[in-house]
């Protein structure tokens, strides 16, 4: 894969789930490099509207350049935790479809200076919004042993968090840990030997945990999903692509809260239609997509529709 090339995951499946209305209003909450947005725009009439959100300035620059002559598109630099206020500022209060693609874009992963990858040497950064203060370098070099253990357990579901947390504290007391590959070497050096021979990289879950902490990823999901659902027009859809079990658990929890309401005994079931329904249990990449794009391997798509 070339540097900065990005292949959108579950592209056609997501657009099919949204069932685009030509005159509708659609929000791509995680623009990235605009794979979903560009396909939505092709299906919109001149009356339709597309709103693109991203907190990454490079993504915003890309979107502004891509859509500079298109009056159907509004580009907003913000975290999707600000979804409601960002849309209301543009007098948008109801929407026909939302997309959340929770994965990192390939340009973010492949750009060494962003510090997301455990395969490339870079300064420990991992900020999606590069204007914020907290970064991976601060976490690795300043968080206490107990706090490191906590984020490794909560955000990485790691079975031996104390071993690596202790190793980080020990190594940084000798020399500051500055780069991604320095951290990788510490993880490899102190990990149980059996973990070094697993298919997945031994640093993968530690990097995931630190990245989630840097960007406060999980804490903002539930609010953003609820905000999106509250703004749906009748027959509007929220489509969410998650990339690990922690994200998917939150998606399922929120969707089930709306779609699986327990009725009082006195309400006849035959006369009741829930306001919201699940569109699917889950959609996963086809064998062809997995072959074409290895980064799609852990993705899961779920959808919720407002019935009336």
UniProtKB/Swiss-Prot annotation:
S-adenosyl-L-methionine binds at residues 34-36, 54, 80, 101, 108. One of its GO terms (molecular function) is rRNA (cytosine-N4-)-methyltransferase activity. It comes from the Bacteria. The keyword RNA-binding does not apply. The lineage of its organism: Bacteria, Bacillati, Mycoplasmatota, Mycoplasmoidales, Mycoplasmoidaceae. This is Ribosomal RNA small subunit methyltransferase H. It catalyses: cytidine(1402) in 16S rRNA + S-adenosyl-L-methionine = N(4)-methylcytidine(1402) in 16S rRNA + S-adenosyl-L-homocysteine + H(+). Its main location: cytoplasm. Pfam families: Methyltransf_5. Coiled coil: none annotated. It is found in: Cytoplasm. Keywords: Cytoplasm, Methyltransferase, rRNA processing, S-adenosyl-L-methionine, Transferase. InterPro entries: RsmH, SAM-dep_MeTrfase_MraW_recog, SAM-dependent_MTases_sf. It comes from Ureaplasma parvum serovar 3 (strain ATCC 700970).
């Amino acid at each position: 894969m070339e540097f900065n090339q990005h292949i959108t995951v579950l592209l056609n499946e997501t657009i099919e789930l949204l069932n685009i209305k030509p005159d509708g209003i659609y929000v791509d909450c995680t623009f990235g490099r605009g794979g979903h947005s560009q396909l939505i725009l092709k299906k919109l009439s001149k009356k339709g509207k597309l709103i693109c959100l991203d907190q990454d300035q490079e993504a915003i620059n890309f979107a502004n350049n891509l859509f500079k002559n298109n009056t159907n598109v509004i580009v907003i630099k913000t975290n999707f935790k600000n979804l409601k206020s960002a849309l209301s500022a543009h007098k948008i209060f109801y929407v026909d479809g939302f997309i959340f693609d929770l994965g990192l874009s390939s340009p973010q992963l492949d750009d060494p200076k962003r510090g997301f990858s455990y395969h490339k040497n870079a300064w420990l950064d991992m900020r999606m919004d590069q204007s914020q203060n907290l970064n991976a370098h601060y976490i690795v070099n300043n968080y206490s042993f107990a706090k490191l253990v906590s984020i490794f357990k909560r955000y990485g579901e790691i079975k031996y968090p104390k071993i690596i947390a202790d190793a980080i504290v020990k190594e940084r007391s000798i020399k500051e840990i500055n780069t991604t590959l320095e951290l990788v070497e510490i993880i490899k050096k102190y990990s149980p030997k059996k973990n070094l021979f697993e298919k997945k990289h031994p640093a993968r879950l530690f990097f995931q945990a630190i990245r989630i902490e840097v960007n406060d990823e999980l804490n903002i999901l539930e609010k953003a999903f609820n905000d999106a659902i509250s703004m749906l027009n009748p027959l509007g859809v929220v489509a969410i692509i998650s990339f690990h079990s922690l994200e998917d658990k939150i998606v399922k929890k929120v969707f089930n809260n709306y779609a699986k309401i327990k009725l009082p005994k006195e309400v006849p079931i035959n006369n009741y239609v829930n306001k919201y329904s699940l569109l699917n249990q889950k959609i996963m990449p086809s064998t062809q997509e997995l072959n074409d794009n290895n980064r799609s391997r852990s993705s899961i798509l779920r959808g919720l529709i407002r019935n009336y």
